[in-house]
Amino acid sequence: MAKSDAKVSQGKRNSAPNAINNVKTRRYSLWNFWICATVLKVLLFPGYYSTDFDVHRNWLAITNKLPLNKWYVESTSQWTLDYPPFFAYFEWFLSQFVPKSVAEDGCLDIVKVGSFGLPTIIFQRITVILSELVLYAALQVFINTSDISEKSANFVVASSIVLSPGLLIVDHIHFQYNGFLFGILISSIVAAKNKRYILCAAFFSIALCFKHIFLYLAPAYFVFLLRAYVLDFSSFKFRSYKDLISIVQWSNLLKLASVVMGIFSLAFLPFITTWQQLLARLFPFSRGLTHAYWAPNVWAVYSFTDKVLTVLVLKLPYLQKILSIVLTSMPKTAADIHVRIESNNSGTRGLVQDVFFVVLPQITPKLTFLLTLFYQILAVVPVLFDPSFKRFVGSLTLCGFVSFLFGWHVHEKAIMLVIFPFSFLVPFDRRLLTPFTLLASAGYVSLFPLLYESQDFLLKFLYTFIWCILYFYAMGQTSKVNRSGVRRIFFFDRLAICYYLLLIPMVLFVQALDVLKHKYAALDKYEFLGLMIYSIYCSIGVLSSWIGLSWLFNFDEPMWN
């Protein structure tokens, strides 16, 4: 018996090093994911594509056929170039590889409306797939540079992003280049994690010069780099205001400023003669508050509330008297309300001009800017006191959140600006899983109206449903449990479960409504009902996620230490 026990004991001692060695030698590669995903994407080549396809085709033509000083002036097509210079250079680069057969197909023609066939479609689809390798490379570096204990969880995060339903729907069906652009942004996040601050600033500056929507994340980067790389409080003792100069590491500040200014100079200096036109293209405030399809944010709820109040006021005259006391800008009579409804674009006609509300006060770009700025300040203040990677990503996520929730003319596709940074947070604490799953499920489902044809319904529904089941479970298994060692169930979690359960019947109901509209003419007057249901229900999920993350970020200090 003694010899037997000794052998068992010896076996246990030998198994521990073997387990460690297995973890060390296991390769977490995204290569197989790229191969499998590419097969699916190639099968989607002949399918639906949006007007964004002709947008990018036109940009290929502009950058290929015209001199650089005409790029932001050309307006033959309504799809004018309205991305920053690096993306224009990117389009020019792609245009150099257009085969003769594709050029003859109309790919490089500057015309009012593009006329092209399968060769152009195949070429442009391939450019999206190949450019997405930047995203795979960035996430592979993220995995490879992780500690052994983090690799499994970080592999789940990385694979969840490369297989994102958002990228499949928006890039490989609808048509855009978000995978490539987020690859550059994620490279900056990975550099921040590895404390490569100059590289972090460089990648973010490059991302910003590719797509200006990343400007919403700039406050988090600015405060993080300032606090982590430029300011040093380790030996600071305040005796006079002159001592404040000593906390600045001037050499680091100079290096940081040189890199950022160098990248922006490279991007914008060639367009110095047309800078006014360039800025007008990048920031078109002539567009309305909401897009044709309301993005699931605060203004969707605001628009819906205005429509409900309009109906109630017309049916209940006494309610109009009560509301007019509080809302001084409200029309005084029912006739005035009808006039405003007829004369104004009230937010459901699929237009991009100014949106006017009937009952509620009008929203201005200035108000949306101030609301966004206020909540972003709240998001970055904690980073001043704790410039850790975890705090930085939390701040980054909240900056993306508030820009999506309160921004002017926000597109539903911008939800990925929140989901992807949030993905990097989940492994740190399982309590973050509930707000993340709310955001991801609501956010990805809110993209469904982009693919409005019935033939695409099963693909978008099943792919998103399977993704949610697999990755919500995997993240729950790999994320860290809080210090108490027990997963605490909050009332918030129970409400989230109810939300998930109702999400599926909501999607099925809207799809049934869409199918029946083609059979029954009486349903034509409810043309925008399905979009409104999507927008409002998904808004509830996104807003709930923001509230949950904000609470944990600001009031659960142990989570971030």
Curated annotation (Swiss-Prot):
It is a multi-pass membrane protein. Residues 1-27, 147-154, 227-252, 388-391, 453-456, 516-527 are lumenal. Residues 49-125, 176-205, 274-366, 412-431, 478-494, 549-561 are cytoplasmic. It comes from the Eukaryota. It holds the Pfam family Alg6_Alg8. GO terms for biological process: dolichol-linked oligosaccharide biosynthetic process; protein N-linked glycosylation. It catalyses: an alpha-D-Glc-(1->3)-alpha-D-Man-(1->2)-alpha-D-Man-(1->2)-alpha-D-Man-(1->3)-[alpha-D-Man-(1->2)-alpha-D-Man-(1->3)-[alpha-D-Man-(1->2)-alpha-D-Man-(1->6)]-alpha-D-Man-(1->6)]-beta-D-Man-(1->4)-beta-D-GlcNAc-(1->4)-alpha-D-GlcNAc-diphospho-di-trans,poly-cis-dolichol + a di-trans,poly-cis-dolichyl beta-D-glucosyl phosphate = an alpha-D-Glc-(1->3)-alpha-D-Glc-(1->3)-alpha-D-Man-(1->2)-alpha-D-Man-(1->2)-alpha-D-Man-(1->3)-[alpha-D-Man-(1->2)-alpha-D-Man-(1->3)-[alpha-D-Man-(1->2)-alpha-D-Man-(1->6)]-alpha-D-Man-(1->6)]-beta-D-Man-(1->4)-beta-D-GlcNAc-(1->4)-alpha-D-GlcNAc-diphospho-di-trans,poly-cis-dolichol + a di-trans,poly-cis-dolichyl phosphate + H(+). It is found in: Endoplasmic reticulum membrane. Its main location: endoplasmic reticulum. The chain crosses the membrane at residues 28-48, 126-146, 155-175, 206-226, 253-273, 367-387, 392-411, 432-452, 457-477, 495-515, 528-548. Keywords: Endoplasmic reticulum, Glycosyltransferase, Membrane, Transferase, Transmembrane, Transmembrane helix. PANTHER family: DOLICHYL GLYCOSYLTRANSFERASE, DOLICHYL PYROPHOSPHATE GLC1MAN9GLCNAC2 ALPHA-1,3-GLUCOSYLTRANSFERASE-RELATED. Belongs to the ALG6/ALG8 glucosyltransferase family. This is Dolichyl pyrophosphate Glc1Man9GlcNAc2 alpha-1,3-glucosyltransferase.
